[in-house]
Amino acid sequence: MAMITGGELVVRTLIKAGVEHLFGLHGAHIDTIFQACLDHDVPIIDTRHEAAAGHAAEGYARAGAKLGVAGHGGRGIYQCGHAHCQRLAGSQGRCIPHPGSGALRDDETNTLQAGIDQVAMAAPITKWAHRVMATEHIPRLVMQAIRAALSAPRGPVLLDLPWDILMNQIDEDSVIIPDLVLSAHGARPDPADLDQALALLRKAERPVIVLGSEASRTARKTALSAFVAATGVPVFADYEGLSMLSGLPDAMRGGLVQNLYSFAKADAAPDLVLMLGARFGLNTGHGSGQLIPHSAQVIQVDPDACELGRLQGIALGIVADVGGTIEALAQATAQDAAWPDRGDWCAKVTDLAQERYASIAAKSSSEHALHPFHASQVIAKHVDAGVTVVADGALTYLWLSEVMSRVKPGGFLCHGYLGSMGVGFGTALGAQVADLEAGRRTILVTGDGSVGYSIGEFDTLVRKQLPLIVIIMNNQSWGATLHFQQLAVGPNRVTGTRLENGSYHGVAAAFGADGYHVDSVESFSAALAQALAHNRPACINVAVALDPIPPEELILIGMDPFA
């Protein structure tokens, strides 16, 4: 009779579910899990902060289309709260935090990290949260947590594992680890809904498709390409769906949904919008009609019925797996060649997107420092299908978005619908773990404000030999909020938004990473090329101008950047 700990049961169950990495930060509460990982050769990516581990699990899940698992000691629930919020708010990472907690017997004893109801804390920011009350329940509940995380709409779950439950030993023959059995296809759309959607799409004169995170998580690029080729409908995306555009011909790529801002002024407002996993919110101009016209018929496909018509009226709502819906649309259109010729409409879309880009380029001049638009162009020139780009910060990702839709990255990860900065380093760290397995590199493009949240993770990169390239757009400020102060209360009321900082590349070098400081297009391009050539973690500290305001920031505060 062999006796095993609860921690051993956790790891055996995760292995049976296909988990290949664990992200976390050690604590005595979860040492049995760490010991079992050592015995079973499960790599642990141990970060310098629990929040980074939580975001890394998400980045790994999003970049690798796998399950991300984070484990941390009792206090970690407080540190990882934002990571749970980020996932629940729409990034849809497939993640399971496994926090340890004080022993059940120690409740109300004022001992180390005991008596805190982690399940109650996590309930509002997770899909499902539960505390394991008996060691023999671990395999069943771990598998239940995994099914909850992987089922649509995807999101974080939390399984609280008390110290004594993990330390307790039971006969290994007394428990059975169940198999993980999931549907391989997800919920397909009702045939009647599919027919109605295709009928509306056929009649439209200026239809567009807008992709969101659920498309990038669940759809095959080949199916999307087949559907688009058959119907001739140009495709846009929000930030989370951007990577799906990489598989489309240039003539069908409208870019980011923000490009639709100027279409109405050109008498080219879409008359039908097919939203495939895109959700109403900040990325669509809320319900303003600036991007998704009120006059347009909207077909919205999402696995979460709560998202259908959240901020604008829609003509048809379909609750279904987005990837499965795209497959069904591709199959249906492949059997019907009688679709309108939309060559002129696609050409108009391409022209308007190019006009926006040219307008931004023409206004992007800076006498005293490198313009962030020009810095973003340098990044774009070095990005291809072998690179995943992670964007963080406010001004940084807004400037970067103006160029990324013109190239074809292997992946593009951003804040998600929550929109909080500071998540990028952890997300990129996890993405680089997944990308190493796929033979890709990851580049984090972040602001000097946002990188400060996790700057200690350069140590993690060096220890774990992760060749992440961290590009810091350094304007020595919390740029977006500084601009807000200047515009809202006056330039003489700027306070608490300056970051007259030191050497970020020096910090990275002190941890053992490669460090570069650049201040021109030429020096930046050379440094990035060198960093990509070297298979090492690197930091490129890019001195950029503060004054330029990206178009989307002006739109958000009610101004017209193209007036």
UniProtKB/Swiss-Prot annotation:
Gene3D superfamilies: 3.40.50.970, TPP-binding domain (3.40.50.1220). GO terms for molecular function: acetolactate synthase activity; benzoin aldolase activity; flavin adenine dinucleotide binding; magnesium ion binding; thiamine pyrophosphate binding. Pfam families: TPP_enzyme_C, TPP_enzyme_M, TPP_enzyme_N. GO terms for cellular component: acetolactate synthase complex. Its EC number is 4.1.2.38. Keywords: Lyase, Thiamine pyrophosphate. PANTHER family: 2-HYDROXYACYL-COA LYASE 2 (PTHR18968:SF166), THIAMINE PYROPHOSPHATE ENZYMES (PTHR18968). Belongs to the TPP enzyme family. This is Benzaldehyde lyase.
